[in-house]
């Protein structure tokens, strides 16, 4: 009974002093020893009692975050590839510096143009001293499909009548697209003249016909063909460029009423009636191509809207305006601008025309003799890995045998091994043996016979395999 009462007293003590340190005394194990007595006091006296301040939590040293590298990558220049984006690994680029990849790898030459998309500048590569046109598009002016132009270039195989794409990267919230440097646009070339002569007009028609046919054969639509997007080299070879509104027929529906991006960005001067309503197809490209040839061949005024817009699409054009064009080309343009899209000829059908076929044969012969630097030389990538391995030119086109054809023909001679040299002799003091051995030469000395040890001799003698 006494033990039960003692346990109850201990329990009461623990309950009353649950916030205090309680321990058993060494001298009297059954007696409780506390640091202070339990007493009733006022709030004033309680406030005067000094309490031990809580321990200070020392700040721990921050450990290296596993996401720190990912945060650094956001500020680094990233090259765009068909599978995503990667950090640029060029030796010309140092991520530790605040300068952009453009400042590291290029020298700025001049501004080529500005627009609602951004700007285009001419720059010279510091490693190759080649000139390029670099298109800069700020992120604030990019739409949802912000990489449409870059991926459009990647999906198009190289062609001599399409502006060549080299690479694209993102840096400092700006999309950069590195392109082939051309001389000027077709619109700038025609500025200040009435119209193109028949020979030049046919060359423009044939060059763009081949480039547009290459696009359509790869299931791509340009959607913005006009003289401003047709570029000329110094040798007057026309190339199709500016793929800001390009679309893939394999991944996007042809008849899509949600083509608001095209309806807002497309130029109404060169759009067909069905394209304005949102129906994009190869026939809408054919219409834009035909009306562009009409403009540079006749110097006709193309309104973006108004009373003159509809008569042109109905081919209600005065004869005196069409007079500078040849009859064959005029008939082709009329077919290309037919109000019924399905009645317009395709690029392959235009190439089968007997007049076009003959002129195309002559044009190809002319272009073959024109030195095209971008056509035959491999693409100069500034990064460690190519974003498009399939776009690189084949090594079979590189003529590497020129270095060996001019070399002097000699028969190599390999000297025989000399076993007569001692370890301490200098091998450079010994001449190589001649081709014709000399009699009684030290090179013909036979090796001295070495008799085997006696134990081995006795072993062979027992087996009758050794003759002395």
UniProtKB/Swiss-Prot annotation:
Annotated protein name in UniProt: Membrane-associated tyrosine- and threonine-specific cdc2-inhibitory kinase wee-1.1
What Gene3D superfamilies does the annotation carry?
A: Phosphorylase Kinase, domain 1, Transferase(Phosphotransferase) domain 1
Subcellular location(s): the record lists: Nucleus
Q: Where is the active site?
A: 224
- Annotated gene: wee-1.1
Q: Which cysteines are joined by disulfide bonds?
A: none
Task: Say where the protein is mainly found.
Answer: nucleus
GO MF terms listed in the record are: ATP binding; metal ion binding; protein kinase activity; protein serine kinase activity; protein serine/threonine kinase activity; protein tyrosine kinase activity
What tissues has this protein been observed in?
In the 12-13-cell embryo, expressed in the E blastomere. In the 16-cell embryo, expressed in the eight AB cells.
Q: Which organism is it from?
A: Caenorhabditis elegans
Query: Reaction(s) catalyzed by this protein?
Result: L-seryl-[protein] + ATP = O-phospho-L-seryl-[protein] + ADP + H(+); L-threonyl-[protein] + ATP = O-phospho-L-threonyl-[protein] + ADP + H(+)
Comp. bias (Basic residues)? 49-61
UniProt-listed Enzyme Commission number(s): 2.7.11.1
Comp. bias (Basic and acidic residues): 25-42
Q: What class of enzyme is it?
A: transferase
Keyword Ligase assigned to the entry: answer is no
What biological-process terms (Gene Ontology) are attached? Answer: cell differentiation; cell division; meiotic cell cycle; negative regulation of G2/M transition of mitotic cell cycle; negative regulation of G2/MI transition of meiotic cell cycle
Q: Tell me where on the tree of life, at the top rank, the source sits.
A: Eukaryota
């Amino acid at each position: 009974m006494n033990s039960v009462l003692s346990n109850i007293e201990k329990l009461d003590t623990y309950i009353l002093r649950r916030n205090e340190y309680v321990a058993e005394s060494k001298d009297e194990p059954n007696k409780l020893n506390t640091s202070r007595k339990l007493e009733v006091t006022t709030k004033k006296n309680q406030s005067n009692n000094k309490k031990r301040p809580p321990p200070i939590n020392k700040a721990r040293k921050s450990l290296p975050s596993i996401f720190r590298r990912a945060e650094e990558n956001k500020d680094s220049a990233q090259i765009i590839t068909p599978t995503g984006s990667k950090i640029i690994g060029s030796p010309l680029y140092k991520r530790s510096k605040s300068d952009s990849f453009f400042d590291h790898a290029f020298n700025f030459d001049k501004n080529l143009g500005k627009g609602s998309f951004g700007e285009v500048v001419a720059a010279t590569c510091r490693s190759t001293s080649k000139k390029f046109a670099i298109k800069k598009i700020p992120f604030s002016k990019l739409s949802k499909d912000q990489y449409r132009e870059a991926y459009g270039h990647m999906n198009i195989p190289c062609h001599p009548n399409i502006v060549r794409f080299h690479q694209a990267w993102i840096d400092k919230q700006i999309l950069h697209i590195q392109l082939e440097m051309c001389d000027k646009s077709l619109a700038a070339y025609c500025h200040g003249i009435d119209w193109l002569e028949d020979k030049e007009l046919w060359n423009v028609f044939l060059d763009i016909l081949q480039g547009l046919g290459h696009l359509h054969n790869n299931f791509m639509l340009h959607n913005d063909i006009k003289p401003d997007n047709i570029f000329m080299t110094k040798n007057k070879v026309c190339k199709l460029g500016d793929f800001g509104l390009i679309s893939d027929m394999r991944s996007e529906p042809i008849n899509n009423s949600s083509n608001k991006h095209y309806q807002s960005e497309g130029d109404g001067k060169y759009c067909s009636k069905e394209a304005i309503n949102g129906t994009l197809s190869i026939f809408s490209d054919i219409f834009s191509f035909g009306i562009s040839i009409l403009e540079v061949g006749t110097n006709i005024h193309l309104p973006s809207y108004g009373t003159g817009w509809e008569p042109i699409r109905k081919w209600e054009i005065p004869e005196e305006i069409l007079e500078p064009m040849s009859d064959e080309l005029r008939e082709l343009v009329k077919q290309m601008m037919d109000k019924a899209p399905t009645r317009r000829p395709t690029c392959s059908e235009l190439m089968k025309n007997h007049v076009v076929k003959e002129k195309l044969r002559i044009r190809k012969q002319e272009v073959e003799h024109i030195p095209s630097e971008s056509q035959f030389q491999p693409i100069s990538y500034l990064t460690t890995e190519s974003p498009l391995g399939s776009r690189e030119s084949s090594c079979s086109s590189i003529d590497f045998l020129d270095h060996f054809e001019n070399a002097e023909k000699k028969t190599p001679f390999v000297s025989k091994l000399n076993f007569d040299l001692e370890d301490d002799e200098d091998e450079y003091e010994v001449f190589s043996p001649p081709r014709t051995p000399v009699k009684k030469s030290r090179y013909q000395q036979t090796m001295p016979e070495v008799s085997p040890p006696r134990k081995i001799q006795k072993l062979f003698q027992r087996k009758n395999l050794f003759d002395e």
